[in-house]
């Protein structure tokens, strides 16, 4: 059941999720702006479309599992009229995640109104493109300068680690982890028209 208040993002699972996927969805919803977690049940994508229209949501985020763990995040934008339905705007492939409770000294965050994607000091073209995709997918803002940090509630910090782009959500006021960690290995951006793979991010060119 959706909340009566206006929401920007609906976060849910694919059908028959594992407990770990459910926990991840709850964590992810807590750090996205004006997001609400919805239990999928037997709801179809069309059902989710009407849920989104009812609360004015601009995004539907669906988390799928691979071997029981969160493995893929599909992001849809509801379009009008209903015959158009949902447009898949991005697909984020994960090698794994770390839940908020698995971080030492992590804190909970409530009523997140704004998310910033931190690109300060990042010159890698691949990472910058993925940052742009995350901004589009999660209705976030790019944090380019230090003074931008205070304008967001949650800050997503990006770093290349081995062959993954590690994305960690930080409370902007305390500097403590307040959400899950995503280990991104590939991104498909259907709006910008590119697909990016993380291995060799410092060397390969976007396609």
Language-model region placement:
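Phospho-regulatory, Ser/Thr- and acidic-rich intrinsically disordered linkers and terminal tails
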Residues: 1-207
């Amino acid at each position: 059941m959706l909340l009566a208040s206006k929401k920007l993002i609906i976060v849910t699972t694919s059908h028959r999720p594992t407990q770990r996927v459910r926990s991840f969805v709850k964590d992810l919803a807590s750090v996205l702006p004006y997001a609400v977690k919805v239990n999928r049940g037997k709801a179809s994508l069309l059902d989710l479309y009407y849920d989104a229209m009812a609360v004015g949501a601009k995004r539907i985020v669906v988390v799928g599992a691979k071997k029981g763990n969160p493995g893929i995040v599909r992001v849809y934008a509801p379009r009008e009229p209903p015959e158009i339905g949902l447009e898949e705007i991005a697909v984020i492939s994960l090698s794994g995640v770390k839940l908020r409770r698995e971080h030492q000294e992590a804190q909970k965050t409530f009523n997140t109104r704004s998310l910033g994607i931190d690109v300060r000091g990042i010159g890698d073209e691949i990472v910058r493109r993925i940052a742009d995709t995350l901004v589009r997918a999660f209705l976030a803002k790019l944090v380019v300068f230090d003074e931008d940090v205070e304008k967001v509630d949650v800050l997503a910090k990006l770093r290349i680690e081995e062959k993954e782009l590690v994305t960690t959500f930080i409370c902007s006021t305390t500097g403590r982890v307040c959400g899950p960690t995503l280990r991104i290995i590939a991104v498909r951006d259907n709006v910008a028209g590119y697909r990016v793979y993380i291995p060799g991010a410092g060397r390969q060119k976007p396609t």
